[in-house]
Amino acid sequence: MNSYKLLTPGPLTTTDTVKQVMLFDHCTWDDDYKQITQTIRRTLLALGHVSEPEYTAVLMQGSGTFGNESVLTSVVGADERVLVCSNGAYGVRLADICRQAGVACTEYAEAFDTVPSARKVAEYLEADPSITH
């Protein structure tokens, strides 16, 4: 039996139960895989208080950065603006993704060891009504 390794960036602990489940191959054409996928999709719609056929959920594989980039580049409209609260590499990366993709953004940056302030976020939102996200 193969002993798969889960290679992920960042500080992360993978439990033995997750590692055990990883030993089973799920193939996209198998009925159990399809059932798992459909259950996840329905659950995501329910969490958003929406339903088919007006809405759907598409599962995408990728890193956390990939997930954030997919949202920023597909959800934010041309006439909308994102407020990025940055206090580290991930926030800097999100602002850079916005700039590279042509997504309007305002960056509220704090030192890497400082928690962003809810008061300052409110001030940014009040000062700039074009911020929509």
Regions found by a protein language model. Give the residues of each.
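Conserved beta-strand segments of alpha/beta enzyme cores
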Residues: 56, 104-106
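Short beta->alpha junction loops
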Residues: 59-61, 108-114
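N-terminal "arm"/small-domain region of PLP-dependent enzymes with the aminotransferase-like
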Residues: 1-31
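A general structural motif
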Residues: 54, 79, 131-132
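Conserved N-terminal alpha-helix of the aminotransferase class I/II PLP-enzyme fold
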Residues: 21-70, 74, 89, 93-99
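Conserved beta-strand elements of the Class I
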Residues: 81-83
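Active-site phosphate-binding strand-loop segment of PLP-dependent enzymes
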Residues: 115-133
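Active-site-proximal loop->helix
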Residues: 93-104, 111, 122-124
